[in-house]
Every structure is written in structure tokens, then in C-alpha cells.
């Protein structure tokens, strides 16, 4: 079956309604039922609870509380590197931005302008720069951390579709990451500006950042923007910056001649938060 045919049902199902329902169920505190669901999830996806700060499944009051569980101290030691991997998961794609085109999968690419919600001036900063698309599976730790020190300057919420995000949809849905709902976080660093984009998906109930809290819902259907130039919000390398309540994908953009990727990286490779993502290219 072709990838386009495989994703055809996703054009037909009520993705928004399913996502709203999933968000409500995931936040519900249903006692023993919640514990049973979490226990099933841990078995189904082989979740390693020994890494969790709290490994006691029965102590989680809601599925969201379990899903966004913190790790115990020392579970992800930080590499001695200029840029750290911000998440647990797998590498979808990474490499050089071709003028303004980001490679998604064979036969598919999308523009940096589309990714950041149409802001051409912002997108131009990453012309011929570097990108990394990192996928978080259901079993993974779902908090996102800083790849390097950064000062927050902007956050942009872009409404969009809610296709599921996986290798099949990456191959079968053109412009997937620039079509789905997303939150774009813009930082300044000693290496220049960089972008961390949190991409939503079917049943991703919401996305949150440490400085704002929950961003969605609500889902107003229009682009929203927050500016932080005067608030001096600074986050250290390795510090938590956000989380998925049910998870998806992170897309990062860096300027030209900034990032030299870890030579051990390759598409589909498993990654862990805190490992070396790359070094300063200058």
C-alpha cells in the first residue's frame, strides 16, 4: 500500500474532535481506571519506569501527570558539547536547509516561511542553515530541553491540521510539519538566533512551555504571538523549556555556519536528551 493511500483515512476522520476528547480523557482523574490505563500503556509501549523520578504507577492521578513525568536526577547526563539533543526519541531528518527548503521525506520538502507561520523576515535568518526534525514516540520522555543557552524573544502559535506524526505520514502528507498545529519558540544565543518548534498531532491534547504554561487549548483558529524582548527570560543549556501532553515532533532551525551535527547521527537513529547533537561550526 502506498503511503498516500495509507494516510487517506486521516483526511476523513474528525481529528480536531478526537484531539479534544483525548485531552479531556488524559486529564481526567479516574482513580483505579486511570491506574489501569497507565499500567496497560507501560506494558504496551515498554515504558522504562525505572528512569522516572516517581516509578509508582498507582501514584499518578491522571494520564497527563504520568505522561509528563520527570526523570530522576542523573538519568540523562549532559554531554560536553556546544549543542545538546533536546529530547528523547528518534531522528526523523536533519541536515542543511536548501535555501529555504526543509527536507521532510523522499519527494517532500516545505519552506521555513511556512513552518514559522508566514513570517518571511524570521525565516530568512535560516536560509541555507541547519535543521533537525526529532520524533517522540509514545514510550518516550515527553519534556523538551534547551540545546544551548538562550534568551527567549518570541513565541508564535500557529493553528493547523492535526495529522498523526510518524514515518508513514511524513512520507504521505506533503508539508506535514508546516500544516499541523505548532508552537514556534525563538531564542537568541551566543551562536545567533535559533528556533525550537513544537509540532502537534492527532490526540496531542496540548503543548506547554515553562514560561507560559499551557498554550493550547484554547484553539482560536488564528495565529497568536507573544514578544519577550523586555522580559529577560533566559534558559540554560539542558534546562526544561516545554512539554507535550501526548507527544509529537520537534523541529529546530539554526543559522548558516552555526551547527556541525554529531557525526554519529543518522535518520531513524534513537536519541536521548542530553547527548551531543553537534558542535559550533565556526
Swiss-Prot record:
Pathway: Phospholipid metabolism; phosphatidylethanolamine biosynthesis; phosphatidylethanolamine from CDP-diacylglycerol: step 2/2. The active site is at 88 (charge relay system), 145 (charge relay system), 248 (charge relay system), 248 (schiff-base intermediate with substrate). The modification Pyruvic acid (Ser) is found at residue 248. It is a peripheral membrane protein. Is synthesized initially as an inactive proenzyme. Formation of the active enzyme involves a self-maturation process in which the active site pyruvoyl group is generated from an internal serine residue via an autocatalytic post-translational modification. Two non-identical subunits are generated from the proenzyme in this reaction, and the pyruvate is formed at the N-terminus of the alpha chain, which is derived from the carboxyl end of the proenzyme. One of its GO terms (biological process) is phosphatidylethanolamine biosynthetic process. It is found in: Cell membrane. GO terms for cellular component: plasma membrane. Keywords: Cell membrane, Decarboxylase, Lipid biosynthesis, Lipid metabolism, Lyase, Membrane, Phospholipid biosynthesis, Phospholipid metabolism, Pyruvate, Zymogen. Catalyzes the formation of phosphatidylethanolamine (PtdEtn) from phosphatidylserine (PtdSer). This is Phosphatidylserine decarboxylase proenzyme.
